Amino acid sequence: MSLPNPADLIRQMAVDLRAHLARREITEPRFIGIRTGGVWVAQALQAELGDQSPLGTLDVSFYRDDFSQNGLHPQVRPSELPFEIEGQHLVLVDDVLMSGRTIRAALNELFDYGRPASVTLACLLDLDAGELPIRPNVLGATLSLAAHERVKLTGPTPLALERQDLAPASAL
Protein backbone atom coordinates (compact mmCIF):
# COMPACT_ATOMS: atom_id res chain seq x y z
CA MET A 1 0.00 0.00 0.00
CA SER A 2 1.42 3.38 -0.96
CA LEU A 3 1.19 6.31 1.40
CA PRO A 4 -0.82 9.40 0.48
CA ASN A 5 0.79 12.67 -0.57
CA PRO A 6 0.77 15.10 2.40
CA ALA A 7 0.26 18.14 0.13
CA ASP A 8 -2.94 16.61 -1.29
CA LEU A 9 -4.19 15.75 2.19
CA ILE A 10 -3.47 19.26 3.48
CA ARG A 11 -5.35 20.86 0.57
CA GLN A 12 -8.43 18.77 1.38
CA MET A 13 -8.01 19.41 5.10
CA ALA A 14 -8.03 23.17 4.41
CA VAL A 15 -11.35 22.82 2.55
CA ASP A 16 -12.81 20.72 5.37
CA LEU A 17 -11.45 23.04 8.07
CA ARG A 18 -12.89 26.11 6.37
CA ALA A 19 -16.32 24.40 6.26
CA HIS A 20 -16.04 23.25 9.88
CA LEU A 21 -15.14 26.73 11.12
CA ALA A 22 -17.95 28.31 9.05
CA ARG A 23 -20.53 25.89 10.52
CA ARG A 24 -19.37 26.87 14.00
CA GLU A 25 -19.24 30.58 13.05
CA ILE A 26 -15.56 30.80 14.03
CA THR A 27 -13.88 33.63 12.13
CA GLU A 28 -10.46 34.14 13.73
CA PRO A 29 -9.11 30.85 15.06
CA ARG A 30 -5.64 30.60 16.58
CA PHE A 31 -3.50 27.80 15.15
CA ILE A 32 -1.30 25.67 17.40
CA GLY A 33 0.97 22.92 16.06
CA ILE A 34 2.32 20.07 18.17
CA ARG A 35 6.07 19.70 17.66
CA THR A 36 7.40 18.74 15.26
CA GLY A 37 5.22 17.37 12.50
CA GLY A 38 2.10 19.13 13.74
CA VAL A 39 3.89 22.47 13.40
CA TRP A 40 4.71 21.69 9.76
CA VAL A 41 1.11 20.67 9.02
CA ALA A 42 -0.23 23.77 10.82
CA GLN A 43 2.06 26.03 8.77
CA ALA A 44 0.87 24.37 5.55
CA LEU A 45 -2.79 24.66 6.60
CA GLN A 46 -2.37 28.34 7.42
CA ALA A 47 -0.76 28.91 4.02
CA GLU A 48 -3.63 27.10 2.24
CA LEU A 49 -6.17 29.20 4.15
CA GLY A 50 -4.29 32.47 3.68
CA ASP A 51 -4.09 32.86 7.47
CA GLN A 52 -1.15 35.03 8.49
CA SER A 53 -1.78 35.08 12.23
CA PRO A 54 1.03 33.96 14.56
CA LEU A 55 1.38 30.20 14.97
CA GLY A 56 1.59 28.70 18.43
CA THR A 57 3.75 25.65 19.05
CA LEU A 58 3.48 23.04 21.80
CA ASP A 59 6.10 20.62 23.05
CA VAL A 60 4.12 18.21 25.20
CA SER A 61 7.10 16.18 26.47
CA PHE A 62 6.54 17.08 30.14
CA TYR A 63 2.78 16.47 29.88
CA ARG A 64 2.90 12.93 28.52
CA ASP A 65 1.61 10.18 30.80
CA ASP A 66 4.39 7.84 29.61
CA PHE A 67 7.16 10.29 30.60
CA SER A 68 8.29 8.10 33.51
CA GLN A 69 8.49 5.02 31.26
CA ASN A 70 10.07 6.52 28.14
CA GLY A 71 12.09 9.36 29.63
CA LEU A 72 12.56 12.80 28.16
CA HIS A 73 12.85 13.28 24.41
CA PRO A 74 16.40 14.50 23.66
CA GLN A 75 15.19 17.63 21.84
CA VAL A 76 12.68 19.17 24.23
CA ARG A 77 11.96 22.78 23.36
CA PRO A 78 9.71 25.27 25.10
CA SER A 79 6.15 25.77 23.96
CA GLU A 80 5.53 29.14 22.32
CA LEU A 81 2.06 30.65 22.45
CA PRO A 82 2.19 34.22 21.07
CA PHE A 83 -1.45 34.87 22.00
CA GLU A 84 -3.83 34.39 24.91
CA ILE A 85 -5.54 31.01 25.22
CA GLU A 86 -8.39 32.23 27.42
CA GLY A 87 -11.59 32.57 25.39
CA GLN A 88 -9.93 31.84 22.03
CA HIS A 89 -11.08 29.40 19.36
CA LEU A 90 -8.09 27.13 18.78
CA VAL A 91 -7.15 24.80 15.94
CA LEU A 92 -4.84 22.17 17.43
CA VAL A 93 -2.83 20.42 14.71
CA ASP A 94 -0.89 17.15 14.84
CA ASP A 95 0.62 15.03 12.12
CA VAL A 96 -0.18 11.45 13.18
CA LEU A 97 -2.90 10.42 15.63
CA MET A 98 -2.19 7.01 17.07
CA SER A 99 -3.03 6.33 20.73
CA GLY A 100 -4.45 9.79 21.47
CA ARG A 101 -1.98 10.34 24.32
CA THR A 102 -0.16 13.21 22.59
CA ILE A 103 -3.46 15.05 22.08
CA ARG A 104 -4.45 14.45 25.71
CA ALA A 105 -1.10 15.89 26.81
CA ALA A 106 -1.55 18.90 24.50
CA LEU A 107 -5.01 19.63 25.90
CA ASN A 108 -3.66 19.41 29.45
CA GLU A 109 -0.92 21.89 28.60
CA LEU A 110 -3.31 24.28 26.82
CA PHE A 111 -5.66 24.36 29.80
CA ASP A 112 -2.73 25.28 32.03
CA TYR A 113 -2.55 28.51 29.96
CA GLY A 114 -6.27 29.26 30.11
CA ARG A 115 -9.72 28.06 29.09
CA PRO A 116 -10.24 28.27 25.33
CA ALA A 117 -13.69 28.91 23.87
CA SER A 118 -13.24 25.80 21.71
CA VAL A 119 -10.59 23.43 20.38
CA THR A 120 -10.83 22.00 16.87
CA LEU A 121 -8.51 19.03 16.31
CA ALA A 122 -6.94 18.65 12.86
CA CYS A 123 -4.71 15.65 12.08
CA LEU A 124 -2.99 14.66 8.87
CA LEU A 125 -3.33 10.92 9.58
CA ASP A 126 -5.28 8.74 11.97
CA LEU A 127 -3.67 5.31 12.39
CA ASP A 128 -6.91 3.94 13.88
CA ALA A 129 -5.08 2.62 16.95
CA GLY A 130 -6.72 4.80 19.58
CA GLU A 131 -6.36 4.03 23.27
CA LEU A 132 -8.31 7.14 24.29
CA PRO A 133 -11.65 8.45 22.95
CA ILE A 134 -10.06 11.20 20.85
CA ARG A 135 -11.09 11.83 17.24
CA PRO A 136 -10.11 14.71 14.94
CA ASN A 137 -12.70 17.18 13.68
CA VAL A 138 -10.67 17.52 10.48
CA LEU A 139 -8.70 14.57 9.10
CA GLY A 140 -6.50 14.04 6.07
CA ALA A 141 -6.73 10.22 5.93
CA THR A 142 -7.10 7.08 8.02
CA LEU A 143 -4.53 4.32 7.64
CA SER A 144 -4.67 0.82 9.07
CA LEU A 145 -1.20 -0.56 9.67
CA ALA A 146 0.19 -3.81 11.02
CA ALA A 147 1.05 -3.71 14.74
CA HIS A 148 4.77 -3.47 13.93
CA GLU A 149 4.39 -0.56 11.48
CA ARG A 150 4.41 3.19 12.02
CA VAL A 151 4.25 6.24 9.75
CA LYS A 152 6.45 9.29 10.19
CA LEU A 153 6.08 12.71 8.59
CA THR A 154 9.38 14.09 7.33
CA GLY A 155 10.00 17.67 6.32
CA PRO A 156 9.56 20.51 6.49
CA THR A 157 10.21 20.94 2.76
CA PRO A 158 8.90 18.89 1.13
CA LEU A 159 6.55 17.11 3.49
CA ALA A 160 6.61 13.36 2.93
CA LEU A 161 5.29 10.27 4.68
CA GLU A 162 7.65 7.43 5.49
CA ARG A 163 6.64 3.93 6.55
CA GLN A 164 8.69 2.44 9.41
CA ASP A 165 8.87 -1.23 10.34
CA LEU A 166 9.52 -1.76 14.05
CA ALA A 167 9.63 -5.56 13.87
CA PRO A 168 12.98 -7.14 14.72
CA ALA A 169 14.76 -8.49 11.65
CA SER A 170 14.46 -12.06 12.98
CA ALA A 171 10.65 -11.71 13.18
CA LEU A 172 10.37 -10.99 9.47
Swiss-Prot record:
InterPro entries: PRibTrfase_dom (IPR000836), PRTase-like (IPR029057), PyrR (IPR023050), PyrR_bifunctional (IPR050137). A motif (PRPP-binding) lies at residues 90-102. It is an enzyme of class 2 (transferase). The keyword Transmembrane helix does not apply. Pfam families: Pribosyltran. Keywords: Glycosyltransferase, Transcription, Transcription regulation, Transferase. Belongs to the purine/pyrimidine phosphoribosyltransferase family. PyrR subfamily. This is Bifunctional protein PyrR.
